[in-house]
């Protein structure tokens, strides 16, 4: 039964419709496919409960709100460079939400990359999970249309001259790639940590940057099959993909997580910092 579920979730889910004697194949969107995992107990249990952590900004980070085209407001944690710059990194949360661990990661990026502003987007609109049950509910309730509206609202906030890199983990790994697609010509880089890739080659063809893809070989969900398919699709789209695989498990890069792998974290973090430094 477990094997059948995995095949259903990770395989290509298609439906067919006939119009003028042509067959149209519809793929399950990446965000929806990843959200389906939350209905599986094994996936939820793989996410170790994060340790309590309170981040106090040393770089002047603060929460802001901005308008979105869908008529709603959005929230973000923003750290601005002392000297004005159009370089921005958009940060995307794990399935827990925009918690203090993500704010700490944002500040690390800000400090180590240099010459950038950093914006961690609240993709759950104020909801924050401290247990697996709510994390799963929030992830399943998330709609990509709303996510796209948040990213577009952020783009209006940073302006038409901004150069934007994206990074995220878990749920946010997939959102990092979706945001890179949404940002369009202003995208300069994209980093994914164990996130669900986009499968639509035609969409991938619109990417304005390469992608740095980081994943864990012990991850049962964002696994080798998923990663191999992503490589094939990026090649078909004519886009550069750099891949680093670590002998670790899903969530290894979260220092507040019991599954944290310090060696893999330090190496992947160094590669992420170097990647963004090469973009700005």
Regions found by a protein language model. Give the residues of each.
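Serine-hydrolase catalytic machinery in alpha/beta-hydrolase-like enzymes
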Residues: 22-57, 62-157
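C-terminal catalytic histidine-bearing segment of alpha/beta-hydrolase fold enzymes
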Residues: 28, 235-280
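Short alpha-helix in the alpha/beta-hydrolase fold that links the catalytic acid
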Residues: 105, 223-233
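Alpha/beta-hydrolase fold nucleophile elbow
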Residues: 158-169
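Gly/Ala-rich beta-loop-alpha elbow adjacent to hydrolase catalytic centers
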Residues: 168-172, 176
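A conserved short beta-strand
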Residues: 185-196
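Short beta-strand/loop motif that positions the catalytic acidic residue
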Residues: 207, 213-215
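Acidic catalytic loop of the alpha/beta-hydrolase fold
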Residues: 218-222
């Amino acid at each position: 039964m477990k094997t059948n579920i995995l095949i259903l979730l990770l395989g290509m889910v298609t439906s067919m419709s006939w119009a003028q004697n042509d067959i149209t194949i519809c793929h399950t969107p990446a965000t929806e496919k990843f959200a389906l995992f939350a209905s599986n107990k094994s996936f939820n249990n793989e996410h170790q409960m994060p340790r309590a952590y309170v981040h106090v900004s040393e770089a002047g980070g603060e929460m802001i709100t901005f308008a979105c085209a869908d008529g709603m407001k959005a929230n973000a944690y923003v750290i601005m460079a002392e000297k004005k710059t159009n370089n921005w990194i958009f940060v995307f949360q794990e399935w827990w939400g925009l918690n203090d661990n993500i704010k700490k990661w944002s500040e690390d990026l800000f400090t180590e990359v240099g010459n950038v502003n950093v914006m961690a987007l609240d993709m759950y609109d104020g909801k924050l999970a401290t247990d697996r049950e709510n994390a799963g509910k929030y992830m399943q309730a998330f709609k990509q249309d709303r996510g796209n509206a948040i990213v577009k609202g952020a783009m209006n906030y940073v302006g038409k001259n901004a150069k934007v890199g994206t990074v995220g983990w878990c749920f946010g790994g997939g959102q990092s790639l979706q945001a890179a697609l949404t940002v369009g010509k202003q995208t300069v880089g994209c980093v994914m940590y164990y996130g669900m890739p986009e499968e639509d080659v035609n969409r991938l063809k619109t990417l304005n940057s390469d992608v740095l893809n980081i994943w864990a070989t012990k991850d049962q969900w964002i696994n080798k099959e998923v990663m191999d398919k992503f490589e094939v699709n990026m090649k078909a789209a004519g886009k550069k993909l750099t891949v680093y695989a670590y002998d670790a498990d899903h969530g290894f890069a979260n220092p507040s997580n019991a599954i944290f792998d310090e060696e893999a974290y330090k190496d992947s973090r160094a590669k992420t910092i170097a990647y963004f430094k090469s973009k700005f």
